[in-house]
Amino acid sequence: MNTRGCVNNNKMIFMNALGLQPQSKVKIIAHKTLEKFKRDAYTCFKGVKAIKNELKTYNLTLQQYNEALNQCALNDSRWRDTNNWHHDIKEGVKINKRHIYRVNFNSKTKEIKEYYYIKVECYVNN
């Protein structure tokens, strides 16, 4: 009868033979967080708030939190880039207020710098 420890041992032997390493805890948390919110459509910076609040529910150090936030930003951009179109049919104007969130991650110090942008795009039809 195989125990869980025996099965995990066999998996590790197989992964080592292929030269693979198991994913880190932070990458697994980032993936679970993105899976939870992948179907939601966000306006403004509500996606950023939702992802940050979800990451706070895990017991992570500040460095792990920063790394998980960076992993989320690298793997999916839907929660950090939003298009908010407003159509004015009478005037023939289309306005898009894009809310853009960027993360600059320093892998040595495990610190992040956050940037919030609002980009206004306007199209006029004659």
UniProtKB/Swiss-Prot annotation:
Subcellular location(s) of the protein: Virion
UniProt superkingdom: Viruses
GO cellular component, one term: viral capsid
Keywords of this entry: Capsid protein, Virion
Name of the protein: Putative 15 kDa capsid protein
Protein species of origin: Bombyx mori nuclear polyhedrosis virus
